[in-house]
Amino acid sequence: MLPKQYRLKKRTAFKATYKVRHSSHSGGVTLFAGIEKKEDIPTRVGFVVSKKVHKRAVKRNRLKRLLRESYRQLLKENNLYGSDKFLSLVFVGSENALGKSFDEIKNSVKKTLEKL
């Protein structure tokens, strides 16, 4: 699990990130990125899977867990904790990502981050 300081929590933070509209897409994962106004705030991340993707919460939550874990592992591998970029990121899972394995989702997350 990501430490609390690295998570987007409020609806206003999610909306502000969506408004900036810097985005990239790969394999059923879309990434929206925004720049934080305050420079003392580290990069914060949120994960979203809407009811349009699947009506069952179990499926949506599983996809969110896979997205979270793949992002966390990429941070650990690349030693990006405490990076000097002041971003807010929102990963949005789509229907295409539902049946994929962890490795496929991890590659999709990696590609979206590289495109950014």
Predicted regions and their residues:
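Positively charged, solvent-exposed patches that mediate nucleic-acid binding
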Residues: 1-116
